[in-house]
Design a protein with these regions (language model features):
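Feature detects long, helix-prone N-terminal segments enriched in hydrophobes
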Residues: 135-139, 145-155, 159, 267, ...
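Gly/Ser/Thr-rich active-site loops/lids in small-molecule metabolic enzymes
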Residues: 273-321
Length: 414
C-alpha cells in the first residue's frame, strides 16, 4: 500500500487548487476478482494488460460451493421456480445455498412438507446484520431488474458473478430464461461464460462540507469566489465534513425537489469546477447500465454497459438548452444545494435510502472499481440489443414499402 504523508497530502491539495486532475479520465481499472473464487480468464493476447471487453470470460480459481439465491419477494408465482432451483442446487450439484431469512420463513415454504428436507439445509442471513460478502461464490437472481439491483446492494465491495433469470415484469438486465436453468447453470459452473462488467458509482454523502460565512452561504453562484472556475482553498474544509453514507450504486443517483413545490436548485461540480446550476425537478447521475432506466425516461441516450462513462441528465429543467451530457468515467462529480435555493433537496440511490440534503451538504460521485460481473446468455453485444428490442421495443415502426411495390399497386388500381 502507498504510504500517505503530510507532504503527499499537501501536493494533492496544491494540485486540486491549481486545476490539475487527480483522477484518471477513463476511470479506475475494474477489479478482476469477483468474490472468493471467481475471476476473469486471463487473455495472453491482450495488449498492455488492457483486455478487450468482448473477450472477457469467467473462470474459477476453485470449484464454486456457496450459491446465493435472491428471489423477488411477495410474488407467489416465483415460489415453485425457487423451490425447483434450490432442489437442483442442493441435491444434484451439492451446493450450499444461501437465502434471506424472510424467504426461508415464508409461510408457503413452511407448509410444503416435500420441500422440508431442502429447506432445512438452506443457510439464511439478514440484510444489514449478517455479512456474507466473503463466502458467496455465485449469485442467482429470480425476478426482474429490481432483484439484480437489490443483489448489488448487498455487496459494497467485490461482487460475485451474477446470473439473472427473467421472471419479473421488464427484465432488461435478466437475459436468461428459466425453462433451461439446469443447462445454463451447469455451463456457468464449468467456467468460460461471457460476462459484462457493469460499472457502479461510488457515492459519498458529506454533511456540512461547505464552509459558511456567518452561517450564510454566498447569495448566488456568481458571487462564489473562484480561481479559474475552481473552488478556492478555504471554501471547502475536509475536516469539517462528515461522511454519513457511502454506497455502491448500480443504476443511478437521483437528486430531486422532494415534496416541495419550488424548483430544485443545485450546483454541479466536475473535479472541483462549477459547470452548471440545475434548476428544475432535479438531476440524474447514472451509470451506462442506468442509462436505460430513469435517465432514458428523462430523455437521455442509452449507453452500452462497456462504455466507460457517467451520464448526467436533468429532470424537467427550466431551460430549453439543458441537454443530457456524458462525461468520462474517471471524473468526480459533486452536487451541492445552491446558496440561493429556496428549499432543500432529496437524494436516493437506486431508488433506496432516500434522504434530505441541506445547505452545506454535498454528494460526491465517481466510478467505483467494483463492478457487477453480469453473466451473459449469449454475448455482451447480442444481449444488450436483444434487451433493447424485446423490453424497450427500440426503433419499432411499420416497415416502409419498396417503391416498386407502391408503383405496382397504383398501376393495378388504375
Amino acid at each position: 500500500p502507498v504510504q500517505v504523508t503530510k507532504e503527499t497530502a499537501g501536493r494533492e491539495e496544491v494540485a486540486r487548487h491549481s486545476g490539475k486532475r487527480a483522477h484518471f479520465l477513463h476511470g479506475p481499472y475494474p477489479a478482476t476478482h469477483f468474490g472468493p473464487k471467481a475471476c476473469i480468464l486471463p487473455n495472453p493476447t491482450s495488449v498492455m494488460h488492457i483486455q478487450d471487453p468482448a473477450s472477457q470470460r469467467l473462470t474459477w480459481n476453485k470449484p464454486p460451493v456457496n450459491v446465493l439465491v435472491i428471489r423477488k419477494i411477495r410474488d407467489e408465482s416465483l415460489v415453485e421456480p425457487f423451490k425447483e432451483l434450490c432442489r437442483f442446487l442442493v441435491e444434484e450439484k451439492q451446493m450450499m445455498v444461501y437465502v434471506e431469512r424472510r424467504v426461508a420463513d415464508d409461510a408457503t415454504l413452511s407448509k410444503d412438507e416435500a420441500f422440508g428436507s431442502i429447506r432445512n439445509q438452506l443457510c439464511t442471513f439478514r440484510e444489514g446484520y449478517d455479512d456474507i460478502s466473503d463466502c458467496i461464490d455465485l449469485i442467482i437472481c429470480l425476478g426482474g431488474d429490481g432483484t439484480l439491483l437489490y443483489a448489488s446492494s448487498l455487496f459494497q465491495g467485490s461482487v460475485p458473478p451474477v446470473m439473472a433469470f427473467h421472471l419479473g415484469s421488464l427484465g432488461f438486465l435478466t437475459p436468461f430464461k428459466f425453462e433451461s436453468y439446469k443447462t445454463e447453470v451447469a455451463k456457468v459452473f464449468e467456467g468460460n461464460a461471457a460476462i459484462t462488467l457493469r460499472s457502479r458509482l461510488k457515492v459519498k454523502v458529506v454533511k456540512d462540507m461547505l464552509q459558511r460565512t456567518g452561517q450564510q452561504l454566498y447569495e448566488s453562484p456568481q458571487q462564489q469566489p473562484e480561481h479559474n472556475g475552481l473552488l478556492p482553498h478555504g471554501h471547502t474544509n475536509s475536516e469539517a465534513g462528515k461522511v454519513t453514507l457511502q454506497l455502491q450504486v448500480l443504476n443511478e443517483v437521483v437528486v430531486d425537489r422532494g415534496p416541495s413545490s419550488y424548483l430544485s436548485n443545485v450546483d454541479l461540480y466536475l473535479d472541483g469546477r462549477l459547470i452548471t446550476s440545475v434548476q428544475g425537478d432535479g438531476v440524474i447521475v447514472s451509470t451506462p447500465t442506468g442509462s436505460t432506466a430513469y435517465a432514458a425516461a428523462a430523455g437521455a441516450s442509452m449507453i452500452h454497459p462497456n462504455v466507460p462513462a457517467i451520464m448526467v441528465t436533468p429532470i424537467c429543467p427550466h431551460s430549453l438548452s439543458f441537454r443530457p451530457i456524458v462525461v468520462p468515467a474517471g471524473v468526480e462529480l459533486m452536487i451541492t444545494l445552491s446558496p440561493d435555493a429556496r428549499n432543500t433537496a432529496w437524494v436516493s440511490f437506486d431508488g433506496r435510502r432516500r434522504q434530505e440534503i441541506q445547505h452545506g451538504d454535498c454528494i460526491k460521485i465517481t466510478t467505483s472499481c467494483y463492478p457487477v460481473p453480469s453473466i451473459c446468455c449469449h454475448d455482451l453485444v447480442y444481449d444488450w440489443f436483444e434487451s433493447l428490442a424485446q423490453c424497450l421495443h427500440w426503433n419499432v415502426r411499420k416497415r416502409q414499402a419498396r417503391l416498386a411495390d407502391i408503383s405496382d399497386s397504383s398501376d393495378t388500381e388504375n
